[in-house]
């Protein structure tokens, strides 16, 4: 489930960036670097210290979830480009909602008791 939900979360992020932000592509730094972080966390989850990777995935997904919400608030330190329209807000709703399954599954895994050999 972790991989499927990570793919959904990543897709929501990419759709937000490429479809809603002016001039963004899959290789724009605003998309490429977060994609690399996601890939590294999933590689660590698959082959490295799983608990630490799960905590990292949880933090990363929570950051994306909060970013999807906070970045549309009218805070003076945030740039408002593109314009804050219903279309833009709908992309943020999509972006935030696609993070929820990954937050939930990683939270459940972090809370699962660890077994000692």
Which residues does each predicted region cover?
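Polytopic alpha-helical membrane-helix bundles and their juxtamembrane interface segments
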Residues: 1-117
């Amino acid at each position: 489930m972790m991989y499927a939900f990570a793919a959904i979360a990543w897709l929501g992020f990419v759709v937000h960036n490429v479809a809603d932000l002016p001039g963004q592509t899959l290789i724009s730094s605003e998309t490429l670097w977060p994609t690399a972080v996601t890939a590294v966390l999933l590689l660590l989850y698959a082959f490295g210290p799983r608990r630490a990777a799960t905590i990292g995935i949880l933090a990363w997904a929570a950051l994306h979830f909060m970013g999807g919400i906070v970045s549309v608030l009218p805070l003076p330190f945030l740039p408002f480009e593109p314009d804050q329209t219903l279309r833009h807000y709908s992309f943020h709703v999509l972006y935030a909602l696609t993070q929820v399954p990954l937050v939930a599954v990683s939270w459940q895994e972090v809370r699962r008791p660890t077994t000692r050999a």
